[in-house]
Amino acid sequence: MDSIFFGKLNIEVAAASGIEAVVKRELVRLGYEPSGANLGRIEFEGTFEDVLRANVFLRSANRVRIVLAKFKAETFDELFDGIFSMRWQDVLTRDARIIVDAKSVKSKLFALSAVQSVVKKAIISKLSTVYNGTFDESGAPYCIEAAIVDDVVTVTLDTSGEGLHKRGYRTYLGEAPIRETLAAAMIQLSVWNPERVLIDPFCGSGTIPVEASLIGLDIAPGMNRNFACEQFANAPKVREKVQDEAEQRIKRDRQLRISGFDINKDAIKLALKHAERAGVKDNIHFQVQDMRDLSSKYAHGVIITNPPYGERLMKEDELKALYRDFGRVTAKLDEWCVYAITSYRGFEKYFGRRADKVRKLYNSELECNFYQYLASPPPKRDGQTR
């Protein structure tokens, strides 16, 4: 029996709708040649070390999987046969704890519990013939996904475990938190770079300033957590090598100008805790401040924020007034770029300006718009990028 983890692998990166291109650019910067960037999935070829690198370094991706097989199945018999034909002995250890997940889109096989049952039965049947006996599934978990789209089954093995938004620094949640992966994507969709000023006037528990600091200092988001693939007994041990690479990339001496403000003092306390846990507390200025008091000594800068929205946080009349005030305050910062994400469809009307660009993004399952207001770039200083 040969383990697949010592050869070339087809690796799939899952991303939220709307940010596939961001993840693709991240993969290119890591040295890979990804193919496609749609339907929330991007693929590239690599080794098991590349699987772990993707988990450690990707900022905007949801998770990383290994593609095991693709085949057409319109009946449960075809599904069983396709799964049974695979060399599961090269993927799973004899004591593997097998977990099966399923998804179905525009396919004849749409009963997910039945799909899960058939897939698990086929895997067990195959391994029983190989090992000539039973097994207790007492080892490391191996999560298999059967995703059926247009009657084509893609079988993958999850390597991440918990979603990649779980960085390890955010243990306390404020009101209406934004996912770390989405915050990182918003920053990368903006014109901000480490040479520029960044302010989040509704910073809440600090996710956007923290993610910007991680980007600015080149700190890998997955440095301080573990991944499911590290438990695979039949895979090479490469964490130390990847961790060393991540350590060497860090630019601790880089000076950043990142600020987070919020009217809620408890939110600022959370933000400080999260920044400390992320190792970037000294790189962010947090302060209790009403958005209406926002000003800056800098003529040029970037505002990236997740303002309040939704009935749970405030009444609609209060929301409209808040957005009006936000528009008035930022209008005074006329050489600043403004990026705001909200699910409220009337944002542009009450903000007082039509956005230069609007992009549909999802905060967890909530559909939002990412409004982008651009400005002229700052004068370029010697050796400085804009």
Feature roles, as predicted:
Residues V155-L189:
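SAM-dependent Rossmann-like transferase core, predominantly class I methyltransferases
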Residues Q287-D293, K297-R386:
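C-terminal catalytic and target-recognition region of SAM-dependent MTase-like enzymes
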Residues E49-V56, E162-H165, P379-R381:
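Short, charged/polar, Gly/Pro-enriched secondary-structure boundary elements
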Residues D2-A140, R386:
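Non-catalytic nucleic-acid substrate-recognition regions in nucleic-acid-modifying enzymes
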Residues I178-S295, E311-R312, E316-E318:
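Conserved S-adenosyl-L-methionine
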Residues V105-K108, G163, P308-R312:
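A short, flexible beta-alpha/helix-coil linker loop
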Residues D136-D150:
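Glycine/charge-rich, flexible interdomain linkers and switch-proximal surface loops
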